[in-house]
């Protein structure tokens, strides 16, 4: 007779459903209630999916993502997840002086910190140029969470 495998817990449950750290769990839940989530949503086993937003008015090659992300949010919700969108350091090669060459590394480092430090179970990476693509892919690989790239 074999024992059934343990059910896989989402990474975010360390924040929102951790009986070994009830005080911090209560604090995290209280903070995220400000987003309009319910305690039931946060503790209900739904995956929390980050949306790494590279689109902005400062980044023309990624500007389309500002509109596309609305559909991504709707898709995550329809699939039973909880979407959380956050910005990434903007990069535009031709608009920044003296150079945008260091921006890829800044975007990478800041994204690693967000992916590691927040209760995200996966991430949608919005990419669109030779700086955001490697920055986002390297960050997701570094943190080792499920990721999909939208270009």
Model-predicted regions and their roles:
Residues 1-151:
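Metallocofactor- and cofactor-centric catalytic cores in central/energy metabolism, strongly enriched
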């Amino acid at each position: 007779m074999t024992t059934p495998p343990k059910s896989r817990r989402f990474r975010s449950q360390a924040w929102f459903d951790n009986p070994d750290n009830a005080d911090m769990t209560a604090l995290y839940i209280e903070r995220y209630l400000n987003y309009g989530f319910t305690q039931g949503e946060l503790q209900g086993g739904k995956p929390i999916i980050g949306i790494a937003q590279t689109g902005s008015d400062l980044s023309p090659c990624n500007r389309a993502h500002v509109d596309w992300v609305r559909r991504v949010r709707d898709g995550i919700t329809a699939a039973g997840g909880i979407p959380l969108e956050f910005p990434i350091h903007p990069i535009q090669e031709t608009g920044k002086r003296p150079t945008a060459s260091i921006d890829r590394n800044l975007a990478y480092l800041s994204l690693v910190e967000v992916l590691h430090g927040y209760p995200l179970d996966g991430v949608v990476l919005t990419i669109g140029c030779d700086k955001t693509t490697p920055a986002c892919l390297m960050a997701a690989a570094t943190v080792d969470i499920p990721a999909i790239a939208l270009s």
